[in-house]
Curated annotation (Swiss-Prot):
It comes from Eremothecium gossypii (strain ATCC 10895 / CBS 109.51 / FGSC 9923 / NRRL Y-1056). The gene is NOG1. Involved in the biogenesis of the 60S ribosomal subunit. Residues 585-642 are annotated as: Disordered. It holds the Pfam family NOGCT. SUPFAM superfamilies: P-loop containing nucleoside triphosphate hydrolases (SSF52540). Residues 168-340 form the OBG-type G domain. It is found in: Nucleus, Nucleolus. GO terms for biological process: assembly of large subunit precursor of preribosome; ribosomal large subunit biogenesis; ribosomal subunit export from nucleus; rRNA processing. Keywords: GTP-binding, Nucleotide-binding, Nucleus, Ribosome biogenesis. This is Nucleolar GTP-binding protein 1. The lineage of its organism: Eukaryota, Fungi, Dikarya, Ascomycota, Saccharomycotina.
Length: 642
């Protein structure tokens, strides 16, 4: 059972909650959309905005509804106390307003998401989103007063003392300024304000102390005036509800010196007025401020008034003084003893608990028969004649430890547990347990004639081999003609060749899967390959052969004097055919210069990378003031920064 509500989350105002949810939507959802995008993408963009905003509002509303206690589920004391402090109907209406707003926000989001599914353009979807968020904001602004009220209730609930209605409790009550708070400060460490004027205590204060290793709580209640309940204010009603609902020992304080501002007659009259609230409670009347006046110093009329209090059953009068702490601990201890005794008495009165205990300790006794014959215990004669065990007797009955000692003692002798088996035949005791396979006993499937069956199978195999049942296909081929055999072998060779070609083609396709295909113009083709291919197609290659021979004779190299003068040697002609050198290493003398060049290139790329440029030609200038964050009026009056 919850006793304190200090962990309720803060309830923001309507404007603050609106800012929180809309800022969260702006931060956690995409912000860029173009009219050229697909219409499905535009719809999804704005539907996400509406759904995300709805989820933000619902999350905030759920925190409020789950944080505050349900006034119908708490203890009656806390329920009446909250009704007195916060007005129960107002509290329920405020929470109901929040719950209704949650339902309305969900309905708005559902309706506008349905409309956004059929949006025809970016402008139309944007206006629908704007209308949805606007309606949610309107619903939120209508919660201005309930949210302010709930925040005040939350703050006050967090300051309420933690009062356990079911623990051991001493309840201090009486007129104002009779010494209730002073007594609480004397018996506990509670820091209660004490002043010489009335109504210093305006709420319930709780202090704790230990008595006989048990934890007690003492509650200081505000002062009560003798008037009808309908005329009492909220301060007095807190005391009334505490007396009515808490199982405790009530300490009714009185001031005989009348320095509190109320006469003895008024204090006695107040006791009789609230006496119906003391039902099923132990009550003590504590006369305080005995350092000023004692009961013996009163006149007979006032003493008779005090004696009238004793007419209430179980009431005991004690005296004390909180100034010099006279008899303070005695009053506390006496109240604790009365409380413990009453709690034990209430437990014993509970019939259910007593019945459960009696059922546990019930002992059954046999009843005598109708004939009245005395039936004594029967002991068999064989048991009476059993010879007592004597370790020194050589003819004694051997025990298990005697057998163990004869066979080497503990750690050497291994007892056979199967000797204790109770079977029809003692020869079965040491039988080997059969194996179980798939839930069946393997021994049940063993055939005693298995050897004879095996011999029969072997004879049948020999007969089949003699009849040629297992002859191979090679023997059948030997009986065929040579032409048929040759035809079969050619077909088999063709099939094998076809399979190899298919495998090679598949490997080629797999090898070229992630590589560039060499263009046909770059592939080297010799004249002999072309001649062989054209001949296979049936073309006459004699004309091409003569042209090839003439071209080869013309290009045959002969060195002349001009070639020597102008340097047209073999190396100059074949320079273009040589393998080109690595351009990355051209102009670099050694590895140290290569490393230095790499460092300088990396240094020059640093600034470009810092500016997030794609390359040296990237000159794109991004917007320094994003329009969606800085558009709108910024006047002196109301402004909209969205």
């Amino acid at each position: 059972m919850q006793l304190s509500w200090k962990d309720i989350p803060t309830v923001p105002t309507s404007n603050d909650m609106l800012d929180i949810v809309l800022n969260r939507t702006q931060r956690k959802t995409p912000t860029v959309i173009r009219a050229g995008f697909k219409i499905t993408r535009i719809r999804a963009f704005y539907m996400r905005k509406v759904k995300f905003t709805c989820e933000g509002f619902i999350e905030k509303f759920d925190d409020i509804l789950k944080g505050f206690p349900n006034i119908n589920d708490v203890h009656p004391f806390h329920r009446d106390l909250m009704d007195t402090l916060y007005e129960k109907n107002h509290y329920k209406v405020s929470l109901a307003s929040v719950s209704r707003a949650k339902t309305l926000v969900e309905q708005v989001a559902r309706d506008y998401v349905r409309l956004l599914k059929f949006g025809q353009s970016l402008f139309q979807c944007k206006q629908l989103k704007r209308a949805a968020l606007g309606r949610m904001a309107t619903i939120m602004k209508k919660l201005k007063d309930p949210l302010v009220y709930l925040e005040q209730v939350r703050q006050h609930l967090g300051r309420l003392p933690s009062i356990d209605p079911n623990t051991r409790t001493l309840l201090i009550c009486g007129y104002p300024n009779v010494g209730k708070s002073s007594f609480l400060r004397c018996i506990t460490k509670a820091d209660v304000e004490v002043q010489p004027y009335a109504f210093t205590t305006k709420s319930l204060y709780v202090g704790h102390f230990d008595y006989k290793y048990l934890r007690f709580q003492a509650i200081d209640t505000p002062g009560i005036l003798d008037r009808p309940t309908e005329e009492m204010n909220n301060i007095e009603m807190q005391s009334i509800y505490a007396i009515a609902h808490l199982r405790s020992t009530v300490l009714y304080f009185m001031d005989l010196s009348e320095q509190c501002g109320f006469t003895i007659e008024a204090q006695v009259k107040l006791f009789h007025s609230i006496k119906p609230l003391f039902a099923n409670k132990s009550v003590m009347v504590v006369i305080n401020k005995t350092d000023i006046i004692r009961p013996e110093d009163l006149d007979e009329e006032r003493q008779e008034m005090l004696k009238s209090i004793m007419d209430f059953p179980g009431v005991e009068i004690m005296t004390t003084s909180c100034i010099n702490e006279e008899n303070v601990m005695a009053v506390r201890n006496k109240a604790c003893e009365k409380l413990l005794a009453s709690r034990i008495e209430n437990k014993l009165k509970s019939q259910t608990r007593i019945t459960n205990v009696l059922n546990k300790i019930h002992v059954a006794h046999p009843q005598k028969r109708d004939d009245g014959v005395e039936r004594t215990p029967y002991i068999p004669e064989a048991f009476k004649n059993v010879k007592k065990y004597d370790p020194e007797d050589p003819e004694r009955r051997p025990l298990a430890r005697d057998i163990e000692a004869e066979n080497g003692g503990a750690g050497v002798f291994n007892i056979n547990l199967k000797d204790s088996y109770l079977l029809e035949n003692d020869e079965w005791k040491n039988d080997v347990m059969p194996e179980i396979l798939n839930g069946r006993n393997v021994y049940d499937f063993l055939d005693p004639d298995i050897a004879a069956k095996l011999q029969a199978l072997e004879e049948e195999e020999e007969r089949l081999e003699a009849e040629g049942f297992y002859e191979s296909d090679d023997d059948a081929i030997e009986g065929m003609d040579d032409e048929d055999v040759e035809d079969i072998r050619e077909k088999a060779a063709w099939i094998r060749d076809k399979q190899k070609k298919m495998i090679n083609a598949a490997r080629s396709r797999k090898a070229l899967k992630n590589r560039g295909t060499m263009p046909r113009s770059k592939m080297a083709k010799s004249f002999e390959d072309m001649e062989k291919h054209m001949s296979s197609l049936g073309h006459n290659m004699s004309a091409l052969q003569s042209k090839q021979s003439a071209a080869a004779a013309k290009n045959r190299y002969t060195e002349s004097g001009a070639d020597i003068v102008y340097g047209n040697n073999e190396s100059a002609k074949t320079a273009g055919k040589l393998r080109q050198s690595d351009r990355l290493m051209d102009g670099v003398a050694d590895a140290s210069m290569r490393s230095k060049a790499d460092r300088m290139a990396k240094l020059h790329r640093r600034e470009r990378n810092r500016q997030a440029r794609q390359g040296e030609a990237d000159r794109h200038a991004t917007a320094s003031l994003p329009k969606h964050l800085f558009s709108g009026k910024r006047g002196i009056g109301s402004n909209d920064r969205r």
